Amino acid sequence: MGQKINPFGYRLGITENHRSKWFSDSNKAGERYRDFVLEDDQIRKEMSKDLERAGVSRIVIERTRDRVRVDIHTARPGIVIGRRGAEAERVRAKLEKLTGKQVQLNIFEVKNAALDAQLVAQGIAEQLTNRVTFRRAMRKAQQDAMRAGAKGIRIKLSGRLGGAEISRSEFYREGRVPLQTLRALIDYGFFEAKTTYGRIGVKVWIYKGDMTESEFEEQQAQQNNRPGRRGGDRRPRRGNRSAAPQAAEAPKAEAPAEAAPAAETKE
């Protein structure tokens, strides 16, 4: 399964967090769960389309009762902000018109674009659009990621590579990319290059190392201790083997001690 499923969804709740942070159990039109899911999808599509040149890595959406918070992680924050914040105001006004609520727009800079899989995929797609040979684009992205500190990278291109009449797929890989290890910190990105021969799909996996034991246990404890869940019953089972005999021995030692004084007072 690790070879086929999206690495982000496969590790959701383990090493990855949700990118839509809200809850809805309302039956009112416009506030239902499906309405918010559709609205989140529209927000991401509009932002990816309008800010395509800005190199948007990911968009995180949080909702309150009367406000929507949108966090944009980008490699070029200057393009998103614009001159004197004009572009940011335009984006905010567009989102407020789409959602009908007050929008709080936050812009974060991605400092190391060579280790961001989505930005790497976009970079390769831009080079393919500019008619750079696909092998050269893949090799350059691979070298930049390894120099930036990645422990492994895997790149896949699918389509009419080099203008060939028959579409095919090609892989480039360097280092380790353990897709089935849940504690592995793997970033995944996908983008489509629009060329004169058609669209070419670009997929990128970047392995950044494993989550440490302390970080993993801390994150699991936070999930197991959520209110309304019984996740905390799993880990203590190992300790219950030694706890059971202690509970059985305790009454045997205490029962005679309590019975002896009671008999003496009656006499």
Curated annotation (Swiss-Prot):
Binds the lower part of the 30S subunit head. Binds mRNA in the 70S ribosome, positioning it for translation. GO terms for cellular component: cytosolic small ribosomal subunit. SMART domains: KH (SM00322). Belongs to the universal ribosomal protein uS3 family. This is Small ribosomal subunit protein uS3. Residues 216-267 are annotated as: Disordered. One of its GO terms (biological process) is translation. The gene is rpsC. NCBIfam families: rpsC_bact. Gene3D superfamilies: 3.30.300.20, Ribosomal protein S3, C-terminal domain.
